[in-house]
């Protein structure tokens, strides 16, 4: 499994259980653990692929710190973008991530999410977990970075086996911008083309 498909498996386990109020700042480990336990009941055999994809999109839009992640992945180019470009990029980034990961939902094959602990993070908490595969083998370590936004946790990054998905995405976007002569508009145009008529609004 790729890092994206492994991460998608983790998302699938919590997607159906998540709601904006569910990430209220309590015990961070309990938040992720409880969501994982509840999600499997919702994402049963009766859920269609389209329903699962829609739930993932809702998850990302409501419970991730989308503006903060968007600024991070754009890196130094955020400051060179106009306010209009920044606004469009945040929306396109939201749609793009939902599209990319919802397309990976078929990779889920019964993995289980096990929370192993939590510790304070720079802006909130870091919840450690493992993806346990039904076929056996070593578990995959997944860390959820949570930011406390006025008493509510927002997910700001997810690291799979120590690899930050936000950092990985920033590198990919930087390469696109560099190929566009250092212009953010080149990335915006590409994201616009990839997400056109692909993500329900």
Model-identified regions with their sequence ranges:
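A mature extracytoplasmic/lumenal domain signature
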Residues: 93, 117-119, 131-133, 144-146, ...
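Short beta-strand edge/turn micro-motifs at domain boundaries
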Residues: 139-167
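Early exported N-terminus immediately downstream of N-terminal targeting peptides
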Residues: 26-105
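N-terminal export leaders
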Residues: 3-11
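Surface-exposed, charged secondary-structure patches
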Residues: 99-140, 190-201
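Low-complexity, intrinsically disordered terminal/linker segments enriched in charged
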Residues: 157-201
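N-terminal signal peptide c-region/cleavage motif recognized by signal peptidases
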Residues: 19-21
């Amino acid at each position: 499994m790729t890092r994206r498909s492994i991460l998608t498996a983790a998302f699938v386990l919590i997607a159906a259980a998540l709601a904006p109020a569910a990430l209220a700042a309590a015990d961070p480990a309990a938040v992720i653990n409880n969501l994982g336990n509840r999600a499997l009941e919702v994402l049963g055999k009766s859920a269609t692929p389209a329903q699962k994809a829609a739930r993932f999109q809702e998850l990302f839009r409501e419970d991730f710190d989308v503006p903060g992640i968007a600024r991070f992945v754009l890196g130094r180019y955020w400051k060179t973008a106009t306010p209009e470009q920044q606004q469009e990029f945040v929306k396109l980034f939201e749609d793009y991530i939902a599209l990319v990961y919802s397309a990976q939902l078929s990779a889920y094959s019964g993995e289980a999410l096990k929370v192993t602990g939590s510790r304070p993070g720079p802006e909130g908490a870091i919840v450690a977990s493992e993806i346990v595969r039904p076929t056996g083998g070593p578990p995959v370590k997944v860390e959820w970075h949570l930011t406390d936004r006025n008493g509510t946790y927002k997910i700001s990054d997810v690291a799979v086996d120590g690899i930050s998905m936000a950092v990985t995405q920033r590198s990919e976007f930087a390469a696109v911008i560099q190929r566009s002569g250092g212009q953010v508009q080149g990335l915006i145009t590409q994201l616009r083309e990839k997400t056109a008529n692909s993500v329900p609004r």
